[in-house]
Amino acid sequence: MVRVLFLGPLADLEGAEERFFAAPLDWGGLLAQVSSRVAEQLQDSRVHIACRGSVLSDKTALDAKEGDEVALLPPVSGG
């Protein structure tokens, strides 16, 4: 299983802070498994994905394996 963490407003859109999906998990699989509202947000270039503790420079290259943790990182705003 792959543990997927939904951070910030993405958790609100998904209705959960974490979910578990069957491994392996790639970009297409992730989009198919999450809610349509989260899938839409993931298309935004300001939303990033971390896998195994590293932010992916190309989120479409996601290749999560058994036991991996994937974090969905919403845009950060500040003042």
How would you name each of these model-derived features?
Residues 1-78:
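Ubiquitin-like/PB1-type beta-grasp interaction modules and other compact soluble beta-rich domains
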